[in-house]
Amino acid sequence: MHQSSWKSRRHRRRGHRHSAWFRQHGSNERKDAGAQQSPQGSSDGHGEAPSTSSTAGSSSVPDLPGYYFDPEKKRYFRLLPGHNNCNPLTKESIRQKEMERKRLRLLEEEEQQGKKIARLGFNASSLLQKSKLGFLNATSYCRLAHELQVSCMQRKKVQIQSSDPSALASDQFNLIMADTNSDRLFTVNDVKVGGSKYGIISLHGLKTPTFRVHMHENLYFTNRKVNAMCWASLNHLDSHVLLCLMGIAETPGCATLLPTSLFVSNHAAGDRPGMLCSFRIPGAWSCAWSLNIQANNCFSTGLSRRVLVTSVVTGHRQSFGTSSDVLTQQFAVTAPLLFNGCRSGEIFAIDLRCQNQGKGWKATCLFHDSAVTSVQILQEEQCLMASDMAGTIKLWDLRTTKCIRQYEGHVNEYAHLPLHVHEEEGIMVAVGQDCYTRIWSLHDGQLLRTIPSPYPTSKADIPSVAFSSRLGGARGAPGLLMAVRQDLYCFSYS
């Protein structure tokens, strides 16, 4: 009995010292609360990606194993691993709470601050004054003017008209893709009952002050996942859409050429309804259509350790063996080259003049440290932009095979996310896995704009975007389209 009472007294003394330390530490935190105001970056909202650390806002507080410090309540809470409570406190929930707090703050800044400045010291009046004084040439003036317009774009919700309004309320956007002239938008929607549905949105009505567009339905329906898609110019420019569909059960994957003339009320002048063509190509990760005269009416598909180049007219195929899965592809227009990005981080070009026998077909080799998710060839075909699953975006010089610029701020861990390069405006757009849309300057890699998602951050609700120099056709203004869940938003130049 004496031994048990001695243990009890020792336990009370130990608990008293432990609780006294917590009270003293909490008191100090309350005293220093006014002095520990951490700056949140510039007022234009161009901050970095949300931190993945659960103690990002309390770096001066010691990290206690098994405890979490709440900067709002100024106290520690115990983490409960494996607890079967309906709302356990976990690091993931803490991180989601911090990300949601930052998203709401950025949305509030977007609504309150109509005019923003992409670069310090540059606004409309200063640009005009420097141009008149001869400090800026015409090229620099146009580039900086575009950057200023991008920083001032405001979000407007687009009204979508359809013959089936009930479907618009339930079907969620998965992918969107603008055509070359930016007067059509091809969409892939996830249907509530399962599967996918395709549509084409006419952008001719996308004008201020009423942003109203029409969705053209079609009867084509598939329950298979779309791995990749691109526009195909078979009969004329952007006459078809090339889709890579994933196989299910005993049905193998395929590459499908879907004529846009099959869509209701979407027949161009003199355009007859086309025929849907399917090619049995299982397990395609990526696809690209060739506008090169040396590979006319051909498309490529990136498979597991293989690249296929297929002629639509003759059905002839060329196969090129690779050492890794090919996740992204793009044809050059003037040079007879097909650029490929692999899961291993390698970027290589296939010389289309060579046959698939031998090793002479590999023309250029570049390397990233992670899986390459997107490659974009610039207009003069001397540089290539590439991004990977580590969030790295690099601009490569194809003549010297060296990286000449890196774009910071992109967030990606494992998603297949595209890049959108627009040289006319001098910008590059990418959506991160954190659901933030970021816009950079092609000229120097400056982060010009960070746009939060209208919905809470979720890996299932990553926005799909399309930027165009002329939204709605030849007379349209530059702008950005963002599709997330059932909604379509437009960010246009004011």
From Swiss-Prot:
Where is the sequence biased in composition, kind Low complexity?
51-60
Identify the GO cellular component terms for this protein. Cul4-RING E3 ubiquitin ligase complex
Determine the domain of life of the protein's source.
Eukaryota
What does the record list as GO biological process? protein ubiquitination
Protein keywords: Repeat, Ubl conjugation pathway, WD repeat
Q: Any keyword Repeat?
A: yes
Instruction: Kindly tell me the pathway this chain contributes to.
Output: Protein modification; protein ubiquitination
Region Disordered, as annotated, extends over 1-65
The Basic residues compositionally biased stretches are: 7-20
SUPFAM superfamilies the UniProt entry points to: WD40 repeat-like (SSF50978)
Q: Where are the WD repeats?
A: 367-406, 409-450
Disulfide pairs here are: none
PANTHER family on file:
DDB1 AND CUL4 ASSOCIATED FACTOR 4, DDB1- AND CUL4-ASSOCIATED FACTOR 4-RELATED
Purpose? May function as a substrate receptor for CUL4-DDB1 E3 ubiquitin-protein ligase complex.
- Subunit-structure text: Interacts with DDB1 and CUL4A.
In Swiss-Prot or TrEMBL terms, this protein is called: DDB1- and CUL4-associated factor 4
